[in-house]
Swiss-Prot record:
The gene is ycjV. PROSITE patterns: ABC_TRANSPORTER_1, ABC_TRANSPORTER_2. GO terms for molecular function: ABC-type transporter activity; ATP binding; ATP hydrolysis activity. This is Putative uncharacterized ABC transporter ATP-binding protein YcjV. Pfam families: ABC_tran, OB_MalK, TOBE.
Amino acid sequence: MAQLSLQHIQKIYDNQVHVVKDFNLEIADKEFIVFVGPSGCGKSTTLRMIAGLEEISGGDLLIDGKRMNDVPAKARNIAMVFQNYALYPHMTVYDNMAFGLKMQKIAKEVIDERVNWAAQILGLREYLKRKPGALSGGQRQRVALGRAIVREAGVFLMDEPLSNLDAKLRVQMRAEISKLHQKLNTTMIYVTHDQTEAMTMATRIVIMKDGIVQQVGAPKTVYNQPANMFVSGFIGSPAMNFIRGTIDGDKFVTETLKLTIPEEKLAVLKTQESLHKPIVMGIRPEDIHPDAQEENNISAKISVAELTGAEFMLYTTVGGHELVVRAGALNDYHAGENITIHFDMTKCHFFDAETEIAIR
């Protein structure tokens, strides 16, 4: 079990490329933290600095109150699972899981107990005598997890462990890792570029862009209260719709749209002095409905109708704006069809057009 404190962490390479900038985060014992962001945002580099595989250029890393910047990786009581399984092909599952413990010269009885315990948790008991070549991708990833589990480390680090698996197996392994966290009751830090993994697994999500933390919060918080346009566009699939416009009285207006703003949201805009400058309205696909209400109804033309099974994703053109609408599958929708859509303005978000920061 472990608490981590990352204080003003920096990573600058010799060519002066600033990969991680002033990273600050407090991680409580037993949390499941997910670092998420696009490729090159610094999430894996941050994880590797925690592991001791990358030198920290500035700031302090504390684990249980002890400064770890200069402590070698092997002495940090950390276990790590990588994107590639890195299993020894000539060894059995048992020997792969036991290898690290043998190198530490741990007693054979203890090794046997730990390996069998981990195999039981991961559903690998019947595969212990097999070699990796006889296993599926998901089973190999479980062996890699098992190799980390048997170390009984204070912190588990996972660097995109599911990205080599197919879509169905990723969903299955997502659930297995979440169950594993509950069983082990330990601190886990997980890196992914997949916002769905972040939303479904994390206690808290750390969203990064260009080496800078954009927002830290529970999945529900970052989804419903995004700090800026990047977060609101990155978290959620399909992404949030954005429309640039201005405020005129109690209306959000563009050249072709006029939508009534609820009093509560209008009061915030007035407080933040956003009435006379360009702003961006954001609204999620599920908050635009293909049925008319008393107000805030707009005519839209469907350009693409994607049926995903339980629902449609409607890609529409609305007054020159491209908007995605999430609709139930009870009705049929077709490309080229004209429909009336309703904006639920109680669910909309407003952002400063210049800074892209949420107006609250």
